[in-house]
Amino acid sequence: MALPPSGETQSQDKANYLPQSNPHHLTTYYAHAPGYSHFRNLATTEEEFQPWKLAAAVLESQAMAPLDAFRMTAPLLNPGLAVQSEPLYNLPWYKLSPWNRIPQFTPEVPRFLDSTEHRSSGSSNQNLVLGGGGGQISGQRWEAENLLLPSPVIASLLPDGIKSSQSISVPQTLNQEGKLPFCGFNFTEEELSFVLYGAIASPEHPTDLQHAISGILVPTESSGSNHLHKTLDKDSLQLPEGLCLMQTSFGDVPHFGVFCSDFIAKGVRFGPFRGRVVNASEVKAHRDNSRMWEIFEDGHLSHFIDGKGSGNWMSYVNCARFPKEQNLLAVQHQGQIFYESCRDIQRNQELLVWYGNGYEKFLGVPMNLRVTEQGGQQLSESSEESAEGYRCERCGKVFTYKYYRDKHLKYTPCVDKGDRKFPCSLCQRSFEKRDRLRIHILHVHERHRPYLCSTCGKSFSQSSSLNKHMRVHSGDRPYQCVYCTKKFTASSILRTHIRQHSGEKPFKCKHCGKAFASHAAHDSHVRRSHKDNGRSSCDICGKGFLDQEAFYAHMRLHKTC
């Protein structure tokens, strides 16, 4: 939402113009609109995918729907948009807290050429009915707090007038229900396709053209397939079996897309999306975010993955324009982006990705913000839990990550009140299942380690632990970092390594405040620097030890369980 900085007032004498009804004027009009990255502090309560929406009401100093208005869902991940923009605020959007108060505004009816001024003084909670001509979607409801608004457009860059065939109905007043009447726009399907899949001028190289969606440079001398194929090495993309990179076109503009050469069943997952890790502080230096994904942890922005120049085939998968066209879901799992087929994909169909109904569940992104009548924000229950950490209901201990809270609940007696079916006769623990009791006795009390390494003689309580250990001798490292060439024997080691790229340091010393990327580094620091401050304590269950060897044995016990 392009709001003025604090203390500034908007001009009251700017008129809004609609572009002439042809693709070239539409491209000129939309090319100056800001990208999605400047609207991230705008709350949204929309749950369903509805990309074909045109904004029917904007601030009086702003023009009508930019290219971004056709992709109205979550303004968080957008791997297919190449429209570049300039900063609208002195403070970058990524430094704004997602819980910041959202500036309130009064939606107004736009003023058009040769038309009188029309204003509405309703509250920001008014419902707007939107629609469009040609391939219009009618009957869709749009809340004012969901509205994405473009920045002011320079009048000299717009067409001189409006064709007589473009009849625009500007409502005079609100109806009895306090809502704006229907407002129509005559955009043809061909014009919309040109805007979404046509060519726009590259801001970095004005003589070159870029695809509006993929961001791939379009050859200016020839639009033939032979010339276009020379700009990309398909063999370097390492496409999975059953997929191929093909050229398609909308009108005369060539365009790359990923197609399936064989049938793909529902539920097949591709990935991960490979690229360079970019910290939030570096984003302002990246003018083109067309292939950049945002990674969230516990509902907060962690880092970005930039697929530009990585030779990643997933960066050539285009965005779906409407629900029936979508066949891939973008999901986040363990800090990585995957594409998962949400329906059966027939042979020769193009892969088209967008977000699904499980967007919040997959990404952990706080999407359930609600704007209160006083203008403040009300958090959902899950957002409140993420904001203050994850608390154990039995003992009150707070954990930074849900993973460690769950570990705490699983392995500590604080959650056990002796009311479970299978109590342990050797201690005060009890279990809901008999097999968990058996494993507890073997591992904790009998120190039973039947799985012996034939190479070094080390023993383990579980076969899975032995299998992990054998990788040390065989040299097998199946877990590879997506950001560099390093490989690891265990997924836990890989997770710790990735924090070197992201800069995340979740383990903070309670004595001096110094942060660390791993438990081991944190514990080593405490033992070396704060030995006199007390005895060593387990971060998982809270048990304390004066003897370091006993502490090490206890920590190994958690790893084997």
UniProtKB/Swiss-Prot annotation:
SUPFAM superfamilies: beta-beta-alpha zinc fingers (SSF57667), SET domain (SSF82199)
KW DNA-binding (keyword) present: yes
Biased composition (Polar residues): 7-20
Zinc fingers classed as C2H2-type: ranges: 390-416, 422-445, 451-473, 479-501, 507-530, 536-558
Chain intervals for the UniProt region annotation (Interaction with CBFA2T2): 184-373
One Pfam family recorded for the sequence: PRDM2_PR
Keywords associated with the record: DNA-binding, Metal-binding, Methyltransferase, Nucleus, Repeat, S-adenosyl-L-methionine, Transcription, Transcription regulation, Transferase, Zinc, Zinc-finger
Region annotated Disordered, chain positions: 1-20
Tissues expressing this chain: Restricted to embryonic stem cells and primordial germ cells. Not detected in epiblast-derived stem cells.
GO MF annotation terms: chromatin DNA binding; DNA-binding transcription repressor activity, RNA polymerase II-specific; histone methyltransferase binding; methyltransferase activity; methyltransferase regulator activity; RNA binding; RNA polymerase II transcription regulatory region sequence-specific DNA binding; zinc ion binding
Subcellular location: Nucleus
UniProt xrefs under Gene3D superfamilies: Classic Zinc Finger (3.30.160.60), SET domain (2.170.270.10)
EC number(s) per entry: 2.1.1.-
Residues annotated as binding S-adenosyl-L-methionine: 355
Keyword rRNA-binding: no
GO biological process: cell fate specification; cell morphogenesis; embryo implantation; epigenetic regulation of gene expression; fertilization; fibroblast growth factor receptor signaling pathway; germ cell development; germ-line stem cell population maintenance
Complex and partners: Interacts with CBFA2T2.
Protein name in UniProt: PR domain zinc finger protein 14
